[in-house]
From Swiss-Prot:
It comes from Prochlorococcus marinus (strain MIT 9211). GO terms for molecular function: mRNA binding; rRNA binding; structural constituent of ribosome. Residues 233-243 have a biased composition (Basic and acidic residues). It holds the Pfam family Ribosomal_S3_C. Binds the lower part of the 30S subunit head. Binds mRNA in the 70S ribosome, positioning it for translation. This is Small ribosomal subunit protein uS3.
Length: 243
């Protein structure tokens, strides 16, 4: 079953968190769900070059909180936070409510090459540039291994290299335990529009096992912070706190 079901859906509440965090009645639930879908579609289309991995949405009373996980936060934030205001007005226009309070948090992804969404996006871009799919997969695997992932699986399907008959090919490096629920599996799928047709891309990344507090070993000592290493950037919007 672990090889057929969606890895993220199987692990919701265990190692994966919900992308939308809010409660609603049966009457307003469909409307809010459609709003979330429109917001994600607007952000992915407007900031296609920002390397956005995920968009998390939370609702509290009349306030809407949007958290963006991106590899290039500067593209979204802009100069002196001007991009945040533009994004806020765009979200309000998308949902059709200019008076809605929108709070935006931009979080930088610390390990870009260990993110399944960004790896799938990289593979799609290379395939659309007519790079051979085997070379593209090999380069993606090397980038993920340098990022320190424990396992990786990549599958590409379609008219590979312009072949007359569509087929699927995949490769795996390291461990990818899809049946282990405590395994932190990052999964993403992407489509590449080539001159020969559409290619489907699936990426599984194994980042380790999430242990409970009872199973975790006792810390012996904190490792010193390396010189020159910087913390991941995080921009938190507090413009609506006083309203």
């Amino acid at each position: 079953m672990g090889h057929k079901i969606h890895p993220n859906g199987l692990r919701l509440g265990i190692t994966q968190e919900h992308r939308s965090r809010w409660y609603a009645s049966s009457k307003t639930y469909p409307t809010l769900l459609q709003e979330d879908d429109r917001i994600r579609g607007f952000i992915q289309k407007k900031y296609a070059s920002a390397g956005i991995s995920d968009v998390l949405i939370a609702r509290k009373a009349d306030q809407l909180e949007v958290e963006l996980k991106t590899a290039r936060p500067g593209v979204i934030v802009g100069r002196q936070g001007s991009g945040i205001e533009e994004l806020r007005s765009g979200i309000q226009k998308t949902i059709g409510d200019r008076s809605r309070q929108v709070r935006i948090n931009v979080v930088e992804i610390e390990r870009v090459d260990a993110d399944a969404h960004l790896l799938a996006e990289y593979i799609a871009q290379q395939l659309e540039k007519r790079v051979a799919f085997r070379r593209t997969i090999r380069m993606a695997v090397q980038r993920a291994q340098r990022a320190g992932v424990l396992g990786l699986k990549i599958q590409v399907g379609g008219r590979l290299n312009g072949a007359e008959i569509a087929r699927s090919e995949w490769t795996r490096e390291g461990r990818v335990p899809l049946h282990t629920l405590r395994a932190e599996i990052d999964y993403a799928n992407k489509t590449a529009n080539t001159t020969y047709g559409v290619l489907g891309i699936k990426v599984w990344v194994f980042k380790g096992e999430v242990l409970s507090k009872e199973d975790q070993p006792l810390p012996v000592g904190a490792s010193p912070r390396r010189k020159g290493s910087r913390r991941p950037q995080q921009f938190e919007d507090r413009s609506n706190d006083g309203k």
